[in-house]
């Protein structure tokens, strides 16, 4: 087509068909040569000048070029708003943005104008003739229709009408007759879309696709994979964190339930203490009222006695005597009832204070446990609140999911829950135990004057350094006495002891319930001191020439109070020191009876202690007790040695001697950095109570001497020869403390 146009242009030049600016020159030059042209040639030249196709460069000769020129003229009119024959930059920009609906028209605008700021129809025609779209074939047009316009359903219509690149200007101006009748595009939206696409390629050239960038595709694929993986990981971590948080909330709820139960128990404890105080006040009122009635009965009896003495008539005296007797009987019945109430639990008055002191010390330990449990609870709540605050943000959720804080908080919550459950169990057990003790004893323990008052009243007679239990916990020492030989100071203090109760007080006591602290093994010297006058002194051949040193036994009332004694130590020779052995019979590990520290260290895996002599005596029946009394009475009348009394005693008495013959191993403890050793040192107490039947009637006055005899018999049974205590121990090796005591005596 281009070659054909050039040939036509050359023929036109040969036929004097030249442009207007050359045509004027040629006409002026040929005016003198040809003065009279023919009329036919002049008419033909005038027709060429009036035809617009011939006035353009390159000219148009075909019908398609004429249709294209008309379409371009229509487009030029649409773009030329001011009708000045040229398209300015503003007009083209407005047309591109409003009519063609392009938002970013920079590239299109520069491609249309290039260097020309004023575009005429001739410029538009030249641009179209030199465009690549003008030379499109049918296949190129169909490819443009399918790929860019995306209307493949009209491919057959384009092929039937042989739509090529030269036909696109007609489509660009939306020629209705051509698009509907020939191309058969009835859909208005399709016609509008096809018009815009055709106008785009006519004005701006063919659309070009950028080269396919495989690197971008690879990066995009990797990004998609990473994004999907990250979303899946975040989903799983969020799900896991939600499960952890749900579990943690469940633990918190259980923790709150335990805390509420603890508060309820504390309220019950306060109510019980208030009831105990009320009961104590009522009891005091009843006792006061009873004493008033008894005093009134006594006064009435005295008045009747005076009336009987002052009466002259024997009958009146008898009546007065009967009335007095009746009053005395009533007073006696009341006194017997009161005596039964008071004698049902015949314990020393100091026991109530000691039990109150024990209760207060236990309450202090409970308060420490409670403070620790509350501290653990507060820490767990703070950690849970921190995790809740962190989960409010996206990065906080990821941080919580990746870190181990959830496991740590879960562990802390479980520890706090465990501590609260242990505290609740301890509180219930303590309440029940002290209620049972108060019920059995019959006096108040939980309601007392306080720990300072009890301590000052109980330890006022001794020069002891009182240290509270709560401030410094005990530190148990692993190992036995042999491990402490190198750390033991060369001087072992001997504590002053309390004198055992006389036999009369033992006889009047009707209860066998005594504190374990009062049962302290007595020394052989104290046994010999309590022997009767007829007892042979040859029972101790190993100490013939040494004076009898009185030994004192001191029951430690408090295992955590360090006692400092000013009593001088006892001096023994080498023969006496050889008799000191620290052994234990069979598998029993007997703790020190003067210390209660074993109860604090019971979790270290110690074996249970053997039964004491008091527990042995409590298991006796009433018939065995009566048989023991008879045997002890018979032995007290005879002149046989002490060994005969032991042989004639009951098997329970033999068990008692075997129990008393055991040598207790010392229990070593470290308290506040100071080593405190409490050694038994053969300090066996002779004040073991012997059970005897309690007499409820006061009429039998002839039995007053019997308890005295029984007490003396008990002292005789307890004073067993020293050799019998060591028959089973001569083959055992002494410990290292023996050598230490030898060095001290030297």
Swiss-Prot record:
<feature type="binding site">
    <location>
        <position position="80"/>
    </location>
    <ligand>
        <name>Ca(2+)</name>
    </ligand>
</feature>
<protein>
    <recommendedName>
        <fullName>Stromal interaction molecule 2</fullName>
    </recommendedName>
</protein>
<dbReference type="GO" id="GO:0005789">
    <property type="term" value="C:endoplasmic reticulum membrane"/>
</dbReference>
<keyword id="KW-0325">Glycoprotein</keyword>
<keyword id="KW-0813">Transport</keyword>
<feature type="compositionally biased region" description="Low complexity">
    <location>
        <begin position="527"/>
        <end position="539"/>
    </location>
</feature>
<feature type="domain" description="SAM">
    <location>
        <begin position="136"/>
        <end position="204"/>
    </location>
</feature>
<dbReference type="InterPro" id="IPR001660">
    <property type="entry name" value="SAM"/>
</dbReference>
<feature type="modified residue" description="Phosphoserine">
    <location>
        <position position="621"/>
    </location>
</feature>
<feature type="modified residue" description="Phosphoserine">
    <location>
        <position position="665"/>
    </location>
</feature>
<feature type="modified residue" description="Phosphoserine">
    <location>
        <position position="661"/>
    </location>
</feature>
<dbReference type="GO" id="GO:0016020">
    <property type="term" value="C:membrane"/>
</dbReference>
<keyword id="KW-0109">Calcium transport</keyword>
<dbReference type="InterPro" id="IPR013761">
    <property type="entry name" value="SAM/pointed_sf"/>
</dbReference>
<feature type="coiled-coil region">
    <location>
        <begin position="247"/>
        <end position="394"/>
    </location>
</feature>
<feature type="topological domain" description="Extracellular">
    <location>
        <begin position="15"/>
        <end position="218"/>
    </location>
</feature>
<feature type="modified residue" description="Phosphoserine">
    <location>
        <position position="697"/>
    </location>
</feature>
<dbReference type="Pfam" id="PF07647">
    <property type="entry name" value="SAM_2"/>
</dbReference>
<feature type="topological domain" description="Cytoplasmic">
    <location>
        <begin position="236"/>
        <end position="746"/>
    </location>
</feature>
<dbReference type="InterPro" id="IPR037608">
    <property type="entry name" value="STIM"/>
</dbReference>
<feature type="compositionally biased region" description="Basic residues">
    <location>
        <begin position="733"/>
        <end position="746"/>
    </location>
</feature>
<feature type="region of interest" description="Disordered">
    <location>
        <begin position="684"/>
        <end position="746"/>
    </location>
</feature>
<keyword id="KW-0106">Calcium</keyword>
<keyword id="KW-0597">Phosphoprotein</keyword>
<keyword id="KW-0472">Membrane</keyword>
<keyword id="KW-0256">Endoplasmic reticulum</keyword>
<feature type="signal peptide">
    <location>
        <begin position="1"/>
        <end position="14"/>
    </location>
</feature>
<keyword id="KW-0479">Metal-binding</keyword>
<dbReference type="GO" id="GO:0005783">
    <property type="term" value="C:endoplasmic reticulum"/>
</dbReference>
<keyword id="KW-1133">Transmembrane helix</keyword>
<dbReference type="GO" id="GO:0005886">
    <property type="term" value="C:plasma membrane"/>
</dbReference>
<feature type="region of interest" description="Disordered">
    <location>
        <begin position="490"/>
        <end position="562"/>
    </location>
</feature>
<keyword id="KW-0406">Ion transport</keyword>
<comment type="subunit">
    <text>Oligomer with STIM1. Interacts with ORAI1.</text>
</comment>
<dbReference type="GO" id="GO:0051928">
    <property type="term" value="P:positive regulation of calcium ion transport"/>
</dbReference>
<feature type="compositionally biased region" description="Basic residues">
    <location>
        <begin position="540"/>
        <end position="549"/>
    </location>
</feature>
<feature type="modified residue" description="Phosphoserine">
    <location>
        <position position="523"/>
    </location>
</feature>
<feature type="domain" description="EF-hand">
    <location>
        <begin position="67"/>
        <end position="102"/>
    </location>
</feature>
<feature type="compositionally biased region" description="Basic and acidic residues">
    <location>
        <begin position="625"/>
        <end position="637"/>
    </location>
</feature>
<dbReference type="GO" id="GO:0006874">
    <property type="term" value="P:intracellular calcium ion homeostasis"/>
</dbReference>
<dbReference type="InterPro" id="IPR032393">
    <property type="entry name" value="SOAR"/>
</dbReference>
<comment type="function">
    <text>Plays a role in mediating store-operated Ca(2+) entry (SOCE), a Ca(2+) influx following depletion of intracellular Ca(2+) stores. Functions as a highly sensitive Ca(2+) sensor in the endoplasmic reticulum which activates both store-operated and store-independent Ca(2+)-influx. Regulates basal cytosolic and endoplasmic reticulum Ca(2+) concentrations. Upon mild variations of the endoplasmic reticulum Ca(2+) concentration, translocates from the endoplasmic reticulum to the plasma membrane where it probably activates the Ca(2+) release-activated Ca(2+) (CRAC) channels ORAI1, ORAI2 and ORAI3.</text>
</comment>
């Amino acid at each position: 087509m281009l070659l054909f146009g050039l040939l036509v242009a050359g023929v036109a030049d040969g036929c004097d068909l030249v442009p207007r600016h050359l045509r004027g020159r040629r006409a002026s030059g040929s005016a003198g040569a040809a003065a009279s042209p023919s009329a036919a040639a002049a008419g033909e030249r005038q027709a060429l000048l009036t035809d617009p196709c011939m006035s353009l460069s390159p000219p148009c000769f075909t019908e398609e070029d004429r249709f294209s020129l008309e379409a371009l003229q229509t487009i030029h009119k649409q773009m030329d708003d001011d009708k000045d024959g040229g398209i300015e930059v503003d007009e083209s920009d407005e047309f591109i943005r409003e009519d063609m609906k392009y938002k970013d028209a920079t590239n299109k605008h520069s491609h249309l104008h290039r260097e020309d700021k004023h575009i005429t129809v001739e410029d538009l025609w030249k641009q179209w003739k030199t465009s690549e779209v003008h030379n499109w074939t049918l296949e190129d047009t169909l490819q443009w229709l399918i790929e860019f316009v995306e209307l493949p359903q009209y491919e057959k219509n384009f092929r039937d009408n042989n739509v090529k690149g030269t036909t696109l200007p007609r489509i660009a101006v939306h020629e209705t007759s051509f698009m509907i009748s020939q191309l058969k595009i009835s859909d208005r939206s399709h016609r509008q879309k096809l018009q815009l696409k055709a106008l785009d390629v006519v004005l701006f050239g063919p659309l070009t696709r950028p080269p396919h960038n495989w690197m971008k595709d690879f990066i995009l694929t990797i990004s998609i994979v990473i994004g999907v993986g990250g979303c899946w990981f975040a989903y799983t971590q969020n799900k896991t964190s939600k499960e952890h948080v749900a579990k943690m909330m469940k633990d918190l709820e259980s923790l709150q339930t335990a805390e509420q139960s603890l508060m309820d128990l504390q309220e019950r404890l306060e109510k019980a203490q208030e009831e105990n105080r009320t009961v104590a006040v009522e009891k005091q009122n009843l006792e006061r009222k009873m004493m008033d009635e008894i005093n009134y009965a006594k006064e009435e009896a005295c008045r009747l006695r005076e009336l009987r003495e002052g009466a002259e008539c024997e009958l009146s005296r008898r009546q007065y005597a009967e009335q007095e007797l009746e009053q005395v009987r009533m007073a006696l019945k009341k006194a017997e009832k009161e005596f039964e109430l008071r004698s049902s639990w015949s314990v020393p008055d100091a026991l109530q204070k000691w039990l109150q002191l024990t209760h207060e010390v236990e309450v202090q330990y409970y308060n420490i446990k409670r403070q620790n449990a509350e501290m653990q609870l507060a820490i767990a709540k703070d950690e849970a609140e921190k995790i809740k605050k962190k989960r409010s943000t996206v990065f906080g959720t990821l941080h919580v999911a990746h870190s181990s804080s959830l496991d740590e908080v879960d562990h802390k919550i479980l520890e706090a829950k465990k501590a609260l459950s242990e505290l609740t169990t301890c509180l219930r057990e303590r309440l029940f135990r002290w209620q049972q003790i108060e019920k059995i004893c019959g006096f108040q323990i939980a309601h007392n004057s306080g720990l300072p008052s009890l301590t000052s009243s109980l330890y006022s007679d001794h020069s002891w350094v009182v240290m509270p239990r709560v401030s410094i916990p005990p530190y148990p020492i692993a190992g036995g006495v042999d491990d402490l030989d190198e750390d033991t100071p060369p001087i072992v203090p001997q504590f002053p002891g309390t004198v055992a109760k006389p036999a009369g007080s033992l006889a009047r006591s009707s209860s066998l319930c005594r504190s374990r602290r009062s049962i302290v093994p007595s020394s052989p010297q104290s046994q010999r001191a309590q022997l009767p006058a007829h007892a042979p002194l040859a029972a101790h051949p190993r100490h013939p020439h040494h004076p009898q040193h009185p030994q004192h036994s001191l029951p430690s009332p408090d295992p955590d109070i360090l006692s400092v004694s000013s009593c001088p130590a006892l001096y023994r020779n080498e023969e006496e020191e050889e008799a000191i052995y620290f052994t234990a019979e069979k598998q029993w590990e007997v703790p020190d009876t003067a210390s209660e520290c074993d109860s604090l260290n019971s979790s270290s895996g110690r074996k249970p202690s053997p039964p004491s002599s008091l527990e042995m005596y409590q298991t006796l029946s009433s018939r065995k007790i009566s048989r023991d009394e008879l045997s002890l009475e018979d032995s007290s009348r005879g002149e046989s040695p002490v060994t005969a009394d032991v042989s004639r005693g009951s098997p329970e008495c033999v068990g008692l001697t075997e129990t008393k013959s055991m040598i207790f191993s010392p229990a070593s403890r470290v308290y506040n950095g100071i080593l405190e050793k409490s050694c038994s040192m053969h300090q066996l107490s002779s004040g073991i109570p012997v059970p005897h039947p309690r007499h409820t009637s006061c009429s039998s006055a002839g039995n007053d001497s019997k308890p005295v005899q029984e007490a003396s018999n008990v002292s005789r049974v307890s004073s067993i020869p020293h050799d019998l205590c060591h028959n089973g121990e001569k083959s055992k090796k002494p410990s290292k403390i023996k050598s230490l005591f030898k060095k001290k005596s030297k």
